[in-house]
């Protein structure tokens, strides 16, 4: 389950809007926040991959993947560091990590079709050092823990749009993150729904902002800003 757009790839998740009835946090509930939506998306993408070999969308675009990998290289993250991709979708980011030499990487998604698709893509690439699990990050099994790095490219965005008590689901997300990430471990999040300040508030308990990564800027009506927020937190 992942979504968003970043200067060249991916379908944007709609955030706050003047259409529909926003909840108390300002988000309009959407099918984009439901498991049924993502099951249907990845069932279609799996069929397309089987028929045409098309891997589907690169969520947030290739530049977003490269941005995260550059950060990991800059900070000399060991190639055997344990990395968790939360809401891995088609697993393309896992493939890129493996190609850069990372050898202890895991992708989870609550959609079985997403895990099937990512497994097929990984097999086609001839990679064998990637672990995949069907996991709901809000209701984790006891097997996931002790990761050095957790990465989110749109999953927190989608959870924020869930029609069924999204605020509580966001709180559970933070609890799950705290559980799976090692103390002093890093959390890299890319979002098109949340600003830097809002993400700081959402992850204020137990996490500290380490770095804001550069993202594309826009200018409109005399104002400028970032269409995407990309932050690195460290678990305290």
UniProtKB/Swiss-Prot annotation:
Please tell me which top-level EC class this enzyme sits in.
Answer: transferase
N-acetylserine is found on 2
Q: Where is this region: Disordered?
A: 1-31
Q: What are the EC numbers? A: 2.1.1.-
Give the chief site where it resides: cytoplasm
Q: What are the record keywords, sorted? A: Acetylation, Cytoplasm, Methyltransferase, Nucleus, Phosphoprotein, S-adenosyl-L-methionine, Transferase
Identify a single GO molecular function assigned to this protein. protein-lysine N-methyltransferase activity
Q: One biological-process term from Gene Ontology?
A: peptidyl-lysine methylation
Against CDD domains, the record matches this protein to:
AdoMet_MTases
Q: What happens after mutating residue 218 to A?
A: No effect on elongation factor 1-alpha
- Claim: Ligase is one of the keywords in the record: no
Bias (Gly residues) occurs at 1-11
Localization per record: Cytoplasm; Nucleus
Modification sites for Phosphoserine: 21
Any one of the GO CC terms: cytoplasm
A Pfam family per the record: Methyltransf_31
Family named by the database record: Belongs to the class I-like SAM-binding methyltransferase superfamily. EFM4 family.
Classification via PANTHER family? EEF1A LYSINE METHYLTRANSFERASE 2, PROTEIN-LYSINE N-METHYLTRANSFERASE METTL10
Name under which the protein is recorded: EEF1A lysine methyltransferase 2
């Amino acid at each position: 389950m992942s979504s968003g757009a970043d200067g060249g790839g991916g379908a944007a998740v709609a955030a706050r809007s003047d259409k529909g009835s926003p909840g108390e946090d300002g988000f309009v509930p959407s099918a984009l926040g439901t498991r049924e939506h993502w099951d249907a998306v990845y069932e279609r993408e799996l069929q397309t991959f089987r028929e045409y070999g098309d891997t589907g969308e690169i969520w947030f675009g290739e530049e977003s993947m490269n941005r995260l990998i550059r950060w990991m290289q800059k900070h000399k993250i060991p190639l055997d560091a344990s990395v968790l991709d939360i809401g891995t979708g088609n697993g393309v980011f896992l493939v890129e990590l493996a190609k850069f030499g990372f050898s202890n990487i895991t992708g989870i998604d609550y959609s079985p079709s997403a895990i099937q698709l990512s497994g097929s893509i990984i097999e086609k690439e001839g990679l064998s050092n990637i672990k995949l699990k069907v996991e709901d990050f809000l209701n984790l099994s006891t097997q996931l823990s002790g990761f050095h790095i957790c990465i989110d490219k749109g999953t927190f965005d989608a959870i924020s749009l869930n029609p069924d008590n999204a605020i509580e689901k966001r709180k559970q997300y933070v609890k799950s993150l705290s559980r799976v990430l090692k103390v002093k471990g890093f959390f890299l999040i890319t979002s098109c729904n949340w600003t830097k300040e809002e993400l700081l508030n959402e992850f204020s308990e137990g996490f500290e902002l380490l770095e804001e990564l550069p993202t594309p800027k826009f200018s409109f009506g005399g104002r400028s800003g970032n269409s995407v927020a990309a932050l690195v937190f460290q678990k305290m």
